[in-house]
Structure formats: structure tokens, C-alpha cells
């Protein structure tokens, strides 16, 4: 038998126009209204005053302004908000960071705790000492400078992780998988796309190092299995994959 040749009718896919709420403000033609800005709030701290000057200090990456002020400037130049959203640096009583929102009236905030900044600092110091077999008193000014960059990159990652949660909520963005993973992906993307170093993967690698160190120091208990986050070592390997994808020579 001869099977007659079949002609598959050509399909025409209609052109789709996607309106993205977070494209550049200048020249934007989408319908998302820009009715607010991010702004900084530095709460007083009793137990972590050593970090007050650090969080308000000079930005060594941009070499101008302060780190958090530069982030606010970038965010307000590139993202639209339905209302003002504070980014709060505060003493919280726990090592944490979070995005919080409520309705009636609409309110959102991002909080980064001094306790988390302290934990990041301590973990990165421990990791550096382990990597180079150095005692604390043997660390040089050059060592401390490098550790400072590792801490700053990790705090930067935490900030954009929480911003990932904020944008998912404020823009009602559809996502697949765990929201915590998506927030990690957003943070990694921003650091890889906006970094000023020749090898931008170093930003994500420094942040990933914190999760690797955390997995080596902290013990896993039953609560970790019900946590909304993946295990710290899982987060490390995910970030390492993102960095490798941006630069296979990292």
C-alpha cells in the first residue's frame, strides 16, 4: 500500500505583546503605574553597633556613595512600585531577613537583621581561615579586605533575594516551583547582570560560599525538612550552577 502524502496546514502563531512591569522607567510604555519608591530605614541597635558604620559606610564596589544608598538609587531608577516600600536594617532578636506585606491599607517592607549580617561576617571569617589555614590573629589587612567583599556580596544577595519575593508579590508574577528558589534565582540574575567586576560570577560565588559554610557549621534537625528554603548545601550548589552558567571558567 502507498500511504498518501499528508500536508500539514501551516499554523500562524499570533504575535503576543507582553507588558513587563519592571523595565526601565525612562521611555517605558507599559501600563504599570509608578506611584512609589524604595527608601532606607536604619533602626537603632544596642548589640550590633559595630556594624552601624559598616552598613552606612562607603561602597567599595561602586567606589562612591554608600552600599545601601546605591542599591536604592538603582532600584528606583529601574523598577516601578505601586506605593513606597521601606528597606529596614534592624536588630531583630534572630538571624534573619524577610519580606512582609499586608492589605487594607497596602503596605510592604523588607527587613535585613543585624544578627544575619553578624552571622554572615562570622561564617565568612571562619571559612577564610579554614581555606588558608590561618589563625584569627594572622589575618592581614588584605585578608580582611577580601573577607569584607565576601560579606558585602552575601548581604547584596540577601537583599535581592528578598526583593525577589517583593516583586513576585507586588507585580503578581506567575512562577513555577518553590518561591524561595525563584527568589534565589532572581538574586543571582541581578548580581550576574549588574556586577562591575570583570568576572561577575565572583559575586554569586561569594554568596554561595556562605551557604556552603553554613551547611558545614550548622547541624540539620527535623525542622529543616519542613522549612520553606532548601537545605543550605542545596542552595550552594544551585548558586554554583548559576555562576558556572554565566562563566564556565569561574
Regions found by a protein language model. Name each.
Residues 176-195:
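An active-site-proximal "capping" alpha-helix that borders the catalytic cofactor pocket
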Residues 148-168:
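Short alpha-helix carrying the canonical HExxH Zn2+-binding catalytic motif
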Residues 1, 6, 11, 16, ...:
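Intrinsically disordered, low-complexity repeat/linker tracts enriched for polar/charged residues
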Residues 17-127, 141-144:
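A metal-dependent hydrolase signature that marks the N-terminal structural subdomain at the beginning
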Residues 83-98, 184-185, 200-216:
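Acidic helix-start/capping segments at beta-turn-to-alpha-helix junctions
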Residues 127, 145, 163-173:
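Substrate-binding clefts and substrate-entry loops adjacent to catalytic sites
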Residues 78, 166, 190-193:
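Short alpha-helical functional segments enriched in proximate histidine and acidic residues
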Residues 193-250:
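Long, well-structured alpha-helical subdomains associated
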Amino acid at each position: 500500500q502507498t500511504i498518501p502524502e499528508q500536508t500539514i496546514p501551516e499554523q500562524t502563531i499570533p504575535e503576543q505583546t507582553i507588558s513587563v512591569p519592571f523595565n526601565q522607567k525612562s521611555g517605558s510604555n507599559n501600563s504599570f503605574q509608578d506611584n512609589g519608591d524604595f527608601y532606607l530605614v536604619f533602626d537603632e541597635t544596642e548589640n550590633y553597633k559595630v556594624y552601624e558604620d559598616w552598613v552606612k559606610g562607603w561602597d567599595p564596589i561602586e567606589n562612591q556613595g554608600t552600599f545601601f544608598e546605591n542599591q536604592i538609587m538603582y532600584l528606583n531608577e529601574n523598577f516601578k512600585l505601586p506605593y513606597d516600600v521601606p528597606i529596614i536594617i534592624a536588630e531583630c532578636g534572630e538571624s534573619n531577613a524577610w519580606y512582609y506585606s499586608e492589605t487594607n491599607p497596602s503596605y510592604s517592607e523588607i527587613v535585613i537583621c543585624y544578627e544575619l549580617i553578624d552571622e554572615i561576617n562570622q561564617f565568612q571569617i571562619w571559612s577564610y581561615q579554614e581555606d588558608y589555614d590561618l589563625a584569627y590573629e594572622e589575618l592581614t589587612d588584605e585578608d580582611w579586605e577580601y573577607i569584607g567583599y565576601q560579606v558585602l556580596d552575601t548581604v547584596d544577595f540577601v537583599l535581592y533575594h528578598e526583593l525577589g519575593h517583593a516583586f513576585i508579590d507586588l507585580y503578581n508574577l506567575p512562577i513555577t516551583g518553590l518561591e524561595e528558589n525563584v527568589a534565589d534565582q532572581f538574586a543571582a540574575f541581578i548580581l550576574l547582570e549588574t556586577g562591575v567586576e570583570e568576572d561577575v560570577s565572583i559575586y554569586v560565588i561569594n554568596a554561595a560560599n556562605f551557604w556552603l559554610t553554613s551547611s558545614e557549621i550548622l547541624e540539620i534537625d527535623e525542622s529543616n525538612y519542613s522549612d520553606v528554603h532548601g537545605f543550605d548545601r542545596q542552595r550552594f550548589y544551585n548558586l554554583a550552577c548559576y555562576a558556572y552558567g554565566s562563566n564556565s571558567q569561574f
